[in-house]
Protein backbone atom coordinates (compact mmCIF):
# COMPACT_ATOMS: atom_id res chain seq x y z
CA UNK A 1 0.00 0.00 0.00
CA UNK A 2 1.08 3.53 -0.62
CA UNK A 3 0.20 6.27 1.80
CA UNK A 4 -0.16 9.87 0.73
CA UNK A 5 2.03 11.83 3.11
CA UNK A 6 2.05 15.25 1.50
CA UNK A 7 0.52 17.17 -1.38
CA UNK A 8 2.67 20.02 -2.61
CA UNK A 9 1.42 23.24 -4.14
CA UNK A 10 3.36 22.33 -7.29
CA UNK A 11 1.08 19.35 -7.85
CA UNK A 12 3.17 16.46 -6.56
CA UNK A 13 1.85 13.86 -4.16
CA UNK A 14 4.47 12.50 -1.80
CA UNK A 15 3.87 8.83 -1.09
CA UNK A 16 5.37 6.43 1.41
CA UNK A 17 5.21 2.65 1.39
CA UNK A 18 3.16 1.46 4.36
CA UNK A 19 2.64 -2.24 3.72
CA UNK A 20 4.19 -3.67 0.61
CA UNK A 21 6.42 -6.66 1.34
CA UNK A 22 6.02 -7.81 -2.26
CA UNK A 23 6.76 -4.42 -3.83
CA UNK A 24 9.89 -4.67 -5.94
CA UNK A 25 11.60 -1.51 -7.05
CA UNK A 26 14.73 -1.58 -9.16
CA UNK A 27 16.67 0.74 -6.88
CA UNK A 28 16.69 -0.49 -3.26
CA UNK A 29 17.95 2.87 -1.99
CA UNK A 30 14.80 4.76 -2.90
CA UNK A 31 13.44 6.78 -0.01
CA UNK A 32 10.36 8.49 -1.39
CA UNK A 33 7.95 7.90 -4.21
CA UNK A 34 6.28 10.69 -6.13
CA UNK A 35 3.31 10.48 -8.44
CA UNK A 36 2.98 13.26 -10.98
CA UNK A 37 -0.29 14.93 -10.13
CA UNK A 38 -2.35 17.10 -12.38
CA UNK A 39 -2.97 20.73 -12.43
CA UNK A 40 -6.75 20.64 -12.53
CA UNK A 41 -6.80 21.17 -16.29
CA UNK A 42 -4.37 18.31 -17.02
CA UNK A 43 -6.97 15.65 -17.66
CA UNK A 44 -4.62 12.74 -18.12
CA UNK A 45 -3.30 13.03 -14.57
CA UNK A 46 -6.73 13.79 -13.17
CA UNK A 47 -8.21 10.71 -14.80
CA UNK A 48 -5.34 8.48 -13.72
CA UNK A 49 -5.48 9.65 -10.12
CA UNK A 50 -9.27 9.53 -9.95
CA UNK A 51 -9.25 5.98 -11.29
CA UNK A 52 -6.59 4.96 -8.81
CA UNK A 53 -8.38 6.47 -5.83
CA UNK A 54 -11.81 5.26 -6.89
CA UNK A 55 -10.49 1.72 -7.15
CA UNK A 56 -9.67 1.94 -3.46
CA UNK A 57 -12.52 3.89 -1.90
CA UNK A 58 -15.38 3.77 -4.39
CA UNK A 59 -16.76 6.14 -6.97
CA UNK A 60 -16.51 9.89 -6.54
CA UNK A 61 -14.14 9.76 -3.59
CA UNK A 62 -11.85 12.45 -4.96
CA UNK A 63 -13.01 15.93 -4.02
CA UNK A 64 -9.80 17.85 -3.49
CA UNK A 65 -6.25 17.85 -2.23
CA UNK A 66 -7.32 17.86 1.41
CA UNK A 67 -8.92 14.44 1.03
CA UNK A 68 -5.66 12.99 -0.24
CA UNK A 69 -3.85 13.62 3.02
CA UNK A 70 -3.19 10.29 4.77
CA UNK A 71 -5.06 8.35 2.09
CA UNK A 72 -3.83 4.87 1.28
CA UNK A 73 -4.39 2.84 -1.84
CA UNK A 74 -2.90 -0.21 -3.58
CA UNK A 75 -0.19 0.04 -6.17
CA UNK A 76 -1.06 -1.32 -9.59
CA UNK A 77 1.23 -3.39 -11.77
CA UNK A 78 3.35 -1.40 -14.15
CA UNK A 79 2.26 1.98 -12.84
CA UNK A 80 4.85 4.60 -13.62
CA UNK A 81 5.91 6.64 -10.67
CA UNK A 82 8.39 9.39 -10.08
CA UNK A 83 11.17 8.32 -7.83
CA UNK A 84 12.83 11.24 -6.18
CA UNK A 85 16.15 10.32 -4.68
CA UNK A 86 17.51 13.13 -2.59
CA UNK A 87 21.11 12.19 -1.86
CA UNK A 88 22.64 15.37 -0.52
CA UNK A 89 21.38 18.60 0.93
CA UNK A 90 23.95 21.30 0.43
CA UNK A 91 23.94 24.85 1.68
CA UNK A 92 25.31 27.34 -0.78
CA UNK A 93 26.22 30.97 -0.26
CA UNK A 94 23.18 33.21 -0.36
CA UNK A 95 20.68 30.42 -0.02
CA UNK A 96 20.07 26.72 0.33
CA UNK A 97 19.80 24.14 -2.36
CA UNK A 98 18.82 20.52 -2.62
CA UNK A 99 20.93 18.26 -4.76
CA UNK A 100 18.72 15.43 -5.91
CA UNK A 101 17.47 13.56 -8.91
CA UNK A 102 13.92 12.76 -9.95
CA UNK A 103 13.37 10.19 -12.65
CA UNK A 104 10.74 7.88 -14.05
CA UNK A 105 10.94 4.28 -12.93
CA UNK A 106 8.57 1.39 -13.30
CA UNK A 107 7.31 -0.34 -10.23
CA UNK A 108 6.19 -3.96 -10.26
CA UNK A 109 4.05 -5.98 -7.91
CA UNK A 110 4.86 -9.68 -7.71
Curated annotation (Swiss-Prot):
Cell compartments where the protein resides: Sarcoplasmic reticulum; Sarcoplasmic reticulum membrane
Keywords: Membrane, Sarcoplasmic reticulum, Transmembrane, Transmembrane helix
Transmembrane segments: 33-53
Gene Ontology cellular-component annotations: sarcoplasmic reticulum membrane
Domain of life: Eukaryota
Coiled coil (residue ranges): none
Main location: other
Topology within the bilayer: Single-pass membrane protein
Record's function text: Putative sphingolipid-gated calcium channel.
Subunit structure: Homodimer.
Name the record gives this protein: Putative protein SCAMPER
Organism: Canis lupus familiaris (Dog)
Amino acid sequence: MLKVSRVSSEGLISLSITEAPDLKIRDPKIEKLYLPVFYLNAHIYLNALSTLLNSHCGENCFHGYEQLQNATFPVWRNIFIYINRVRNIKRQGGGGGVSGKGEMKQCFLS
